[in-house]
Amino acid sequence: MTASQDFVVKDISLADWGRRELDIAETEMPGLMAAREEFGKSQPLKGARISGSLHMTIQTAVLIETLKVLGAEVRWASCNIFSTQDHAAAAIAATGTPVFAVKGETLEEYWTYTDQIFQWPDGEPSNMILDDGGDATMYILIGARAEAGEDVLSNPQSEEEEVLFAQIKKRMAATPGFFTKQRAAIKGVTEETTTGVNRLYQLQKKGLLPFPAINVNDSVTKSKFDNKYGCKESLVDGIRRGTDVMMAGKVAVVCGYGDVGKGSAQSLAGAGARVKVTEVDPICALQAAMDGFEVVTLDDAASTADIVVTTTGNKDVITIDHMRKMKDMCIVGNIGHFDNEIQVAALRNLKWTNVKPQVDLIEFPDGKRLILLSEGRLLNLGNATGHPSFVMSASFTNQVLGQIELFTRTDAYKNEVYVLPKHLDEKVARLHLDKLGAKLTVLSEEQAAYIGVTPQGPFKSEHYRY
């Protein structure tokens, strides 16, 4: 990167390829295209300076260009070291949008690129964050706490934190007061995924959330579609591209049966695998059992599994002891946001053989081997290309609406976490029906009055479970 080249991508010559795929993706993303049509003239994001941290895929490229059509300035990095599609990053960089994303980043590069999305040429700060997993938000908040004199950088708990804290110290030395100034300038953040939302709620509970946040993840048109139907298609895609293994007849264990776990279990079952589920929540466990899956503990199931996938958003779900029990050539992977669901660090002293990018063969002293996908990070994005465009259109339309809401109506929100209102959730769904040839039935005035709604909706209460 130079002063005249405000981007970092693998190969800018891939831009034409990326643009061709972008053109196809736009035809599969009716929500984002409708947002351009509705808001393009009014420019509701004019003046917005958005720092985006979200997987730099073809679908994300359509989101970025939608934000720009609506008036925003954007700087972008990927939220995962393996999830970037290099041709997508090149296509965006070629349009003049600063993007810092390469498939296969080091942790040092990852946090440098996260820092770069806040470094505008005029030296002024960002005023919005669009986040996936919370790393961009946490970078600013931890840095501001360090500038205030809190001892938050002296005791890293992981290799990732070591690198993060080093980057914060580097920025503090280069630009004193940077984090405090940046934190004060943020009008709000929209957060894409379960893990990042959990971080925001923890901050709110502690009284440490300094600006409003919109929880995009818990919009119905995100969690019940992206998390479920997206994983239903992309999990098996990632395993197949990574291993070429036949899944029919294999024993697959899915750790967790939330929305991501449900989609993952259906994905593997659809491929012919014999699926078992682990759960800590009795309600989700009962759902899994009544959906026809055997509910087990990983302690009991590890020795018979051919494939084990984590979907929980928790840490240490697959331990080194579990992996010692697994059979030779068991496939181990994760489709939750962070890599700490699997105790990958405990494997580092074993023999690793890289088979191909994001596929490693790990050999134990007794000769047993495991196939680890994407080093325990998101395998559907590391080993494949993530969710299909159509389902991401719904998620990203929520992101756009959330950005508009927080940027244009900042004073209407306290420093708390919010979910988009039901009428906007229904609007997002409505925008995607025509593409599937679906036709809505219209309530009569009498029918609407009978159930206490209007013919135009919203049709369900806020607490309704879809």
UniProtKB/Swiss-Prot annotation:
Gene: ahcY
Source organism superkingdom: Bacteria
One GO cellular component term noted in the UniProt record for this chain: cytosol
Protein name: Adenosylhomocysteinase
Single GO MF descriptor: adenosylhomocysteinase activity
Family assignment from sequence similarity: Belongs to the adenosylhomocysteinase family.
Keywords: Cytoplasm, Hydrolase, NAD, One-carbon metabolism
Reaction catalysis annotation: S-adenosyl-L-homocysteine + H2O = L-homocysteine + adenosine
Residues annotated to bind substrate: 57, 132, 192, 222, 226
Binding site for NAD(+): 193-195, 227, 256-261, 279, 314, 335-337, 380
Function, in words: May play a key role in the regulation of the intracellular concentration of adenosylhomocysteine.
Localization (cell): Cytoplasm
Co-factor requirement: NAD(+)
